[in-house]
């Protein structure tokens, strides 16, 4: 099992540390990867610590909505672009940006498989969504600009370039003949 925690302006891949103390008003994403019988699953959720500002609360809530509508957009024989189009529209409608450098991914015997699931784009584009595919929907939504930077020291943690807050929710989804099934929540 792998754990990552991303606080405030950390977009993803935050490294847990006993030296970091959460404080009143922080938002934190906890991302957990599990392996069962050689198959991977991935899920994350946001937590709000103490008295969170209305702006931070709205970002967390809208990001969850983005994930949910992204999952609802998945249809057998649809396209990966269908997911990104609805996520991007919902985020922009609320004044947020969508991280474009990172996204969801196929999951199976390997942690990251095809397809790359962009959380922006156009409907009816990208890879065909075939029953039996397993992928993550994990929009990373920023309060500021979409641009991100890699931590030069640990070369793993990714931050918003402008220091703005970022939120992420994630579920692992199986595409079935009739719709979807959530495998990791």
Language-model features and meaning:
Residues 1-185:
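Active-site neighborhoods and metal-handling regions in enzymes and metal-associated proteins
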